[in-house]
Each structure stands twice: as C-alpha cells, then as structure tokens.
UniProtKB/Swiss-Prot annotation:
Binding residue positions for ATP: G27, R30, R111, D154, R157, R160, R163
Species: Bacillus licheniformis (strain ATCC 14580 / DSM 13 / JCM 2505 / CCUG 7422 / NBRC 12200 / NCIMB 9375 / NCTC 10341 / NRRL NRS-1264 / Gibson 46)
EC top class, as a word: transferase
Name this polypeptide is given: CCA-adding enzyme
Positions annotated to bind Mg(2+): D40, D42
Amino acid sequence: MEDLFLKALPLLRELKKHGWQAYFVGGAVRDAQMNRDVGDIDIATDASPEEIEAIFPKTVDVGKEHGTIIVLFEGESYEVTTFRAELEYEDYRRPSGVQFIKSLKEDLKRRDLTINAMAMDEEGRLIDYFGGLRDIRERLIQTVGDPAERFHEDALRMLRALRFMSQLEFELSPNTKKAICENRPLLAHISTERKTVEFEKLLKGKAAGRALEAAAETGLYKELPGLDGKKERVLAARAFPFYQLQKSADIWAAFIHMISINPAEAHRFLKGWKLPGKVIRQALHTAERIDQKWDAVSMYEAGEETLLAASAIRSLRDKQAIDEEQLAEIRQSYQALPIKSLKDLAVSGSDLLNFRKKPAGKWVSDDLKRIERAVLNGELANQKKAIEEWLDSCSQI
C-alpha cells in the first residue's frame, strides 16, 4: 500500500471503530493500480456528515448537503463523503438532490468511468464491481453502465472521457465513442468555464493528439468555443506536444498558433473560452511572437518570459522537443541587453524637459522611444551626458 494511503489509514480505522464502513475511492485508487503518482486521497463511508463531524474534532463543511466533509487529520486534509445515490438530473449537468445510502456498490455505480469507480479497503484489497481493473489492463475509457445514460446525467462526462484518454494514454471503448457521437449536442448545456477546465487538462495530457483526433471523429469539437467548422485545424494541432509546456498562457498560445487563429480573431477566440484576462493577454503576447526573428529591439519589447515561451513553442513545433541549449543562448542574449525596461534608461521625461527647455507634449514620449531604440541598437551609451549630447546633435540635423 502506498505511503499516502498508509498515512490516511488511521482515519479509515477510526470510522470503522465507530461502526461505519470506510473505503479509499476515486482517482487515488485508480492511480495506485496504474503505478502512477497518487494525488489526493478520498474516502467514502456510510457515516452521515453529522456523524463524521462528531467523530473528528477538526472538520470543514464544504458541501454537507451533498455528503462531503473535509477532515483535517495529522496535518493533512481528506475529503470524506457519505455513500449517496443521486436523484434525477437537471439540465444535463447536476442532480436535483442526493440520498444518503448504506451500499458501497450503489455509491460507486453513480460514478462516470469504470476506472474511477473502484474502491480499496484498509487491507489494500481492491473492490471492483464494474471492471475498472480490466479496463486499465486493456487501456480503455469505458463508462459505468450505459454511456448514453451517464452522458444524459452530466454531459461534461463526454469531454472528461477524452480528457482521461489524453492523460492516461487510453482509447475510448466502442460503445462510449458511439454514445459521444450521438449525444454530443448535450454539451451545449454545460457552462463554458467547466468545458475550459476539462479541455485545458486534455491539452496537458501526453496523448492530447489522440484525444483531439477523437474530438474530431466524434464531432465533439463542434460543441467547444470557436471550434465549430474548424475540424482540419483541430486535427492540425495533434502533432504538438502541449504537455511539455507548464503555463496555461503558453498552452493557449501554442493552441491558437497550431489551429491557425489569426491575430485579428485571437482575442475574441480566447475570450470565448472565458479565460482570465491575464492569461488572454499573455497568450496573445506570446502567440504573435512565435515566428519572430529576434533582434535587440524585439527581445526588449517581448520581455524575457515571452521571449523564452515563444522560442520554446517554436522549438516544440519544429523539433518536438525544447532545445535547451538554444534557450540558454536566447536567455543570455536577453540578459546582455543594455536596458530591460524604460525605467532603466539613464534619463527620464523630466530630464528631457530640462534639456529641451520646451513645454511638455508628445515629443517627450517620442524622444524617449528614439533614445530607447538607439541604446538597444548599440548606437548610444546609456549615460545621461551622452544622451544629452546625442539629442543636441539630432536637433541640429
């Protein structure tokens, strides 16, 4: 049993000591079976939220009405959820309510995919009612029960299926793929924000290319912001290894570049995904510089972060790998610039007013820009006296 499970074991045993069932569930169980790094440990029990709160002194109510309590235990936080059955779903996205139950099997039955519907007891024994382990061995994404029924309950599960396909490097089972083809319009009922979270996770997976291909094959791409009518462009993005990029803005910059969104459309396209303004600005700033031929001025205007991001994206596009040696040279070139921002200039707007003895006006910013370029291009030393003499000579021409 993994160390993270062992650390949480006393919590499981405490629930059992009080007469309740308790099991490890969810992604941690799946990842342990796949020998992947285990993340958050989740626990399911037949104890009610109130009974969980009565057993453990430190708890946080994060959704008691849905049966979920955070238990703070030995310096860690664990999500402990009461076995539940979900009542009828509304709007293809959420249940009208939940009913607390006593059966682990019925609780696992409501989950989306077989690989996410396994449990593990305190002895490390796997409880697998729906063939999750079989699907792990066969590397298949398969819903628990009828896929059409699962997708009608929550249409986001179709996109989640592709996301797990990307992250785990699995394939869709034939009946799951068929159900996505038939039910994809239901994704229109899901908020853009939820779709964006899943799609970004999809792009970060090692098999994003195969998942994008599945999105094209099933038509699911048509239900995503700004992608309807762009099947060939979506397929063109398959070749890019997005997982090698760390930052959200860089991933979106690479995506709009690979699907050939032109600069005039790019802002509207990214806004359509309801991304944070900062991510949009950074993505646009990077995307427009991916094919930039760098000189001192363009490096200065880009800034180090964008310079390196744009260069990494170009390297990944052309070589399928980041050329670390080339990036080191680019970083060195940037560090060698005489100035990194306007405030690094040896003169300010006030200095120019003193030099020129003229009323303030647009000429101040124009002169600063001229000085900036001359310094960057090595035509002028970044020294106050040299700049004053240079301005004098310019004004006499």
